[in-house]
């Protein structure tokens, strides 16, 4: 209970910019931090005292009066709580838990009906950018270079073409284009709002000439319904012209993953590879499971599985997509080979699928 409540206070720190203010402007009293962030001193004092009591912040003189105490972020906590460009940044998790909790009554009803709850709105927290730092710092600087032949092709001539399916707000596509200056990347996602954000991000990064984004359903050209942004939305297109197709942490969130893999296969040139990165889970069900497995199952119960249950043809995969499950989807899609790659990617496992 203490940990759950503490995460709610982290939500407040992230939402109100309290960590950022301490990081950017240094130690502060409760009145100073309230002034910096446009908040109320008494609320801020309670938040600061809680954070110091729990060790998330430090205080220069605990014996000083309540209004005289100055609080600061310990250096080791800055990457986790304040530096959004660091791969260790985790303060966004507070917002994710708050959003998920808001959905729980509808999820409970979906458990009874067997359908899907209404889509969970991003407001008021806004769309989280939890993968931004990870993708920009690791995807194309460490993970893809660990796949030697893929890395070589992306660096070579003629310039490679890459399709990034389920690209979200575009950070995976942008990361690849930044690391490999010869390539062009076409990102596809069924979320039109995410695509609009991705285009903005690419423009801000100066990559609009090599990175394009299209709202399209990765499940194929005739897709419509819950997985599509609108009836009859076209699929990713450009069949047979891509040297590399990627699906980074998105396949388990698709209601029809085999259809998405089939569309990806059609997009590949010869020779070409589909790289799938998805959750690093155990090969078989175990109980009790590791903390990491418990984490993936929890998100599957409250978010990943409910999101796809509205499609009558859903595969109902959930976040715990084991290698055997992906192998079955791959063979259904017409792939002949699936290889688990030796890429050290933390909580992700990398697969290569070829014709």
Language model: regions and residue ranges:
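Conserved Class I S-adenosyl-L-methionine-dependent methyltransferase catalytic core
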Residues: 2-13, 21, 50-158
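Short helix-to-turn junction characteristic of helix-turn-helix DNA-binding domains
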Residues: 22-26, 177
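A short acidic, leucine-rich amphipathic alpha-helix
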Residues: 30-36
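Short amphipathic alpha-helical interaction segments
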Residues: 39-50
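Conserved adenosyl
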Residues: 99-225, 230-261
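A short glycine-rich, Lys/Arg-flanked "PGG" loop and its adjoining helix->strand segment in the class I
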Residues: 258-270
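C-terminal alpha-helical "lid/dimerization" subdomain adjacent to the S-adenosyl-L-methionine
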Residues: 277-332, 339
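Core SAM-dependent methyltransferase catalytic element
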Residues: 334-355
